[in-house]
Amino acid sequence: MYSIYNHTTGQYGTIYHTLTAARAMAHAYSLWAKNDRDVIDMQTGEVMSQFSKGKETYRAKG
């Protein structure tokens, strides 16, 4: 399971069952709010993607 971390508020958001859904929502939220969001793997704590103002700036392999 994956969650979205909001850099502005320091809070985690909704839990998503698929990485694709989490990345899509992080992209949308980042674009809409013009801020940074991370997609976090809830089991390992690994950052899977980072978005900055709607652009994906990092993507983990896998």
List PLM regions with ranges.
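Charged, amphipathic alpha-helical segments
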Residues: 17-27
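Short aromatic-glycine-(Arg/Gly/Cys) micro-motifs in beta-strand/loop hairpins
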Residues: 1-13, 21, 38-41, 53, ...
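Short, mixed-charge low-complexity intrinsically disordered segments
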Residues: 29-62
